[in-house]
Structure formats: structure tokens, C-alpha cells
A protein has these predicted regions:
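Alpha-helical interface subdomain recognition
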Residues: 1-78, 82-88, 100-105, 112, ...
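Flexible, glycine-rich active-site loops centered on histidine and acidic residues
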Residues: 94-100
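A short, Trp-centered hydrophobic/proline-enriched beta-strand micro-motif
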Residues: 116-124, 168
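Flexible, small-/acidic-enriched active-site or ligand-binding loops
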Residues: 135, 189-218
Length: 384
């Protein structure tokens, strides 16, 4: 749903210029140094990128799902490392608070998240709880007017930059699976919370994932997200469902960048006395890339519009995440093929995108988990 096309166009134009003038020229430096300059993060905050999804009464832009996806399409044209900086505040790091937080929790944290003053992280995954998120072992034991948290969270995006963690922990050890899991708002400076060394990753250099270790970390009882224990897993699933649309839009944006780069290269690279774009086999690759990009974009916009109409989009979100994350991997592979040997060389940047996009098939639900969700929902609809 687009509420005011003129205002949205102004936002998209600003993001588009920022991507082309500030982010793309700094991609190689960020990848080499494995860090994003503070000056760029400050400009992201000035553009309002940290608060895209946060309600206006807390200082955010409160974009609709369709509007947010259109912005994500533009951000996706730059290295995904840049988008990841703001991505947790837009999505998994803030949405649990927006959806299920108490008024006092929202009043304190959301303005700080919207401005970029605080970066948030979503601490669900554990060493033995990846796709099986319901098997988390991190515990939260009530002790008077506080909780004591113990456990280790793994592969937590932006952990070393975060000022706030939404931590999923088990408050009822007797409950099986996802039952008995609660969500907590845990400040980074909490005694007993430590951050591990950033992992060495295949791609998306510039943003970091780390372990978050909770060793008798004491938080006030008021840090429980919402008002009831045992609602954490439900919150997590709602957050991830929404986040899959955003991630899908980012995948489509990256595919768009790779298609543009590949088409331009095919139009100027000469072999056998002519540009390679005149060869039908190269044209076939370009056509396949464009067709899949268009299909992915159409899926994302359709699902986003349905969500804006308050329709249930659990299946559609998983369809988008599954197709778009796989699609951008195929597009990146074809881009390397179009570039030939140059696509394998770092100077051209194509090999970097090839590595960067591999994670999209893994985080916020692997492709195989998306298949399970889609199929189970299809079968469930038969009995509804």
C-alpha cells in the first residue's frame, strides 16, 4: 500500500542517490577493511533508514510493508553489508517490541532505535538450536524482582554494535519445544553479558556476527517483553514472517544490480570480433536473469500489499523468501559466467556479490524450512 506517491518518490530518490554516490563507491573499501565507516552510518541515520518501519510517534517513518520493500529494493543495489547495519533496527531487532512490547518499553526504546542511537539485535539462534528454534536452552530463572539469564547465542548479527538484544530464553524448563520460551529486552551493558569475537565469514564483510554469552546476566523483571511469560516463540515467528518479505526485497535489489552490471558488460566486451551480448547463449543467460528478477519482484510486491491489507501472508512470505533467495544465487552465478574470468577477479566486484548472496538461503529460515512451512500450510488449508 502506497499512501502518498510523491512523498515516497522523494524518499526513494534520496535513497537511490545515497546508494549510487556514497555506498557503491565505498563497497571495495568496506569489504577490505571489514568495517563500515562511521560517517556512512551517520548519513544512514540522517536519511531515516534506521526507523523505516518504526511508528511515527516514536520518531520513525512508519512505512507500509510495500513502501518498505520498495526502499529495500534500492538498498539492495549496494553491497548487502550496508543494508545489514540498519536491517536489524528495521526488522528483527525492533519488530518484536513494536508488535508485543508494553507502552513503557516502546516509549523508552523505539525512539532510540528509530534515530540510530541504539542498534538492536535479535538473539534466537544457539549452538544447538538453528532451524529447530524451539529447542533453545538459554534459561531465564525468576529471582524475586529480576531474571537471571544463562546460555549462549550464536551468529548474532550486529552483536558487537548492538545496544539492545531481544533475547529468547526458556522460562519454563518443564515445557517441551517452543512452549515455555519468553522474550526479553536485554541492554548490551548488562553485567554477565559478553560478546564474542566476530566470526570470519564467507561474505558480507563489513558487518559482523558474534556469539552472545549470558553468564548469570541479571535483568529486571520489567525486561520481559510484553506482559506474559511463554509468548516468546510466537513473537519470534511473527517477527521472522515479516522479515522474510524485507529480505526477499533485498535479494531482488541485488539481482537488479547484478543484471545491470552483466548487461553493461555484455554490451561492451568483445570476442570473436563482436560484443558478447550479440551471442545467443549470452542473451539466454541475460534473459533468464531478467525473467527471474521480474518474477521475484512481482511476488514481493504482491505479498507486501496483502500484508498491508491485514491478510495472512505466512505462506506468501515463505514463498518469497524461498524463491528470491534462491533466485539471487542463480543470478549471481550467471553474472560470473557472463563476466567470464573477470567475474572471478576481485577488482570487478562480481565475485564479492557471489559470496555475499549465499547467506540469504540460510538466515531467517533456510530454504528447506521455507519449503516445510509452505507445504504444511498447504496441507493445513485442506482441513480448515
Amino acid at each position: 500500500m502506497i499512501r502518498d506517491q510523491q512523498i515516497l518518490d522523494q524518499l526513494l530518490d534520496g535513497v537511490r542517490r545515497f546508494v549510487s554516490e556514497e555506498l557503491i563507491p565505498n563497497e571495495a573499501q568496506v569489504a577490505a577493511q571489514n568495517d563500515i565507516p562511521t560517517s556512512l552510518v551517520t548519513k544512514m541515520a540522517e536519511l531515516g533508514l534506521f526507523g523505516l518501519s518504526i511508528p511515527t510517534n516514536y520518531g520513525g517513518l512508519e512505512l507500509t510493508m510495500e513502501e518498505e520493500c520498495l526502499v529495500a529494493l534500492e538498498l539492495g543495489r549496494a553491497s548487502p553489508a550496508f543494508r545489514t547495519v540498519v536491517g536489524t533496527n528495521i526488522g528483527i531487532g525492533s519488530q518484536g517490541l513494536i508488535m508485543d512490547g508494553r507502552p513503557d518499553q516502546k516509549d523508552y526504546w523505539l525512539p532510540r532505535l528509530a534515530s540510530g542511537e541504539v542498534i538492536s539485535s535479535f538473539a534466537l539462534t544457539e549452538p544447538d538450536a538453528g532451524s529447530d528454534a524451539g529447542s533453545i536452552r538459554t534459561s531465564a530463572v525468576r529471582d524475586g524482582d529480576c531474571y537471571r539469564l544463562n546460555g549462549t547465542k550464536r551468529f548474532i548479527t550486529n552483536a558487537d554494535k548492538a545496544g539492545l538484544f531481544t533475547v529468547m530464553a526458556r522460562t519454563d524448563p518443564e515445557s517441551q519445544g517452543s512452549r515455555g520460551v519468553s522474550a526479553f529486552l536485554v541492554p548490551a551493558q548488562t553485567p554477565g553479558l559478553t560478546i564474542g569475537i566476530p566470526e570470519k565469514k564467507m561474505g558480507q564483510h563489513g558487518t559482523h556476527v558474534c556469539d552472545v554469552v549470558l553468564n548469570d546476566a541479571e535483568i529486571p523483571a520489567s525486561a520481559l517483553l510484553g506482559t506474559e511469560e511463554g509468548k516468546g516463540f510466537v513473537t519470534a515467528m511473527k517477527v521472522l514472517e515479516r522479515g522474510r518479505l524485507h529480505i526477499s526485497a533485498v535479494c531482488v535489489g541485488i539481482a537488479d544490480r547484478l543484471i545491470d552490471e552483466s548487461t553493461r558488460y555484455a554490451a561492451q566486451r568483445k570476442q570473436f570480433g563482436q560484443v558478447i551480448g550479440e551471442f545467443q547463449l549470452v542473451q539466454g543467460m541475460l534473459a533468464d536473469m531478467k525473467t527471474e528478477w521480474y518474477a521475484g519482484r512481482s511476488m514481493v510486491i504482491d505479498a507486501a500489499r496483502k500484508k498491508d491489507l491485514d491478510e495472512t501472508v505466512a505462506t506468501e512470505s515463505s514463498c518469497c523468501k524461498y524463491f528470491c533467495s534462491e533466485m539471487v544465487g542463480r543470478v549471481a552465478d550467471r553474472a560470473v559466467q557472463v563476466f567470464g574470468g573477470a567475474g572471478y577477479i576481485a577488482d570487478y566486484g562480481i565475485e564479492r556479490f557471489y559470496r555475499d548472496v549465499r547467506i540469504f538461503r540460510l538466515y531467517e529460515g533456510t530454504s528447506q524450512i521455507q519449503q516445510l512451512i509452505i507445504a504444511r500450510n498447504m496441507l493445513r488449508e485442506l482441513t480448515d
